[in-house]
C-alpha cells in the first residue's frame, strides 16, 4: 500500500495594514459654522449625535415647476428675526424628498439639498434637510452623518472651530504688519 500524501496547509500570509485615518478634530456641543454657497457665515449650530441627518433652518420652502418643465425648490435661509438673515431666495434644481424623524420621533417629509459646510477651515459637501426651525434655539443641526469619522465631541466646550479661525486671523494680521 502506498503512502497517502496530504497537501501541507499553509496559512494565509497575515499583513498588518494600518489604514491611516485622518485625525479626528474635537468640536464642542455648539459650533459657529459657515455655508459659503448660501452666503451664511458664523451661524450657530447644535451638534446632535442623536440625529442622523443635519438640518438647516429656512422659510418659504416651496416646490415649483419652471417653464422648461423642470422641478425646483425655492427657499430663504434663516428668518427675519435672525441676525444673519439676508432675505435672498435660493433655488435648487437638485434635491430629494425624504421621510425624516423630527426631534419628537414623528416622521416628516422634507426636502434635502446638498451644500458645503465649512468648519475648522475644512469644507464638507453633504446633505441637509430643509426645515422651519424658527421655534428652536439653534437654526442649524449637525447630525451623525457629518460627524462620523471626522469629529469627537467635547460637551464641555463650544465654538472651537471659531476660536481657531479667530486665532488664525490674528496670526495673519500680525505677519502682515
Predicted regions: what they are:
Residues 2-177:
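Pepsin/retropepsin-fold aspartyl endopeptidases
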Amino acid at each position: 500500500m502506498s503512502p497517502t500524501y496530504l497537501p501541507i496547509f499553509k496559512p494565509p500570509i497575515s499583513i498588518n495594514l494600518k489604514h491611516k485615518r485622518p485625525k479626528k478634530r474635537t468640536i464642542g456641543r455648539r459650533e459657529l459654522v459657515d455655508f459659503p454657497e448660501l452666503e451664511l457665515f458664523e451661524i450657530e449650530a447644535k451638534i446632535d449625535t442623536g440625529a442622523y441627518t443635519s438640518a438647516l433652518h429656512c422659510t418659504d420652502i416651496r416646490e415649483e415647476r419652471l417653464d422648461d418643465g423642470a422641478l425646483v425648490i425655492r427657499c430663504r435661509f434663516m428668518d427675519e428675526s435672525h441676525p444673519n438673515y439676508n432675505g435672498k431666495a435660493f433655488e435648487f434644481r437638485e434635491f430629494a424628498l425624504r421621510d425624516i424623524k423630527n426631534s419628537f420621533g414623528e416622521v416628516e417629509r422634507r426636502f434635502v439639498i446638498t451644500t458645503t459646510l465649512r468648519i475648522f477651515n475644512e469644507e464638507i459637501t453633504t446633505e441637509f434637510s430643509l426645515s422651519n426651525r424658527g421655534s428652536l434655539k439653534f437654526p442649524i443641526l449637525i447630525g451623525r452623518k457629518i460627524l462620523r469619522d471626522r469629529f469627537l465631541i467635547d460637551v464641555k466646550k463650544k465654538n472651537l472651530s471659531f476660536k481657531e479661525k479667530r486665532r488664525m486671523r490674528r496670526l495673519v494680521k500680525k505677519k502682515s504688519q
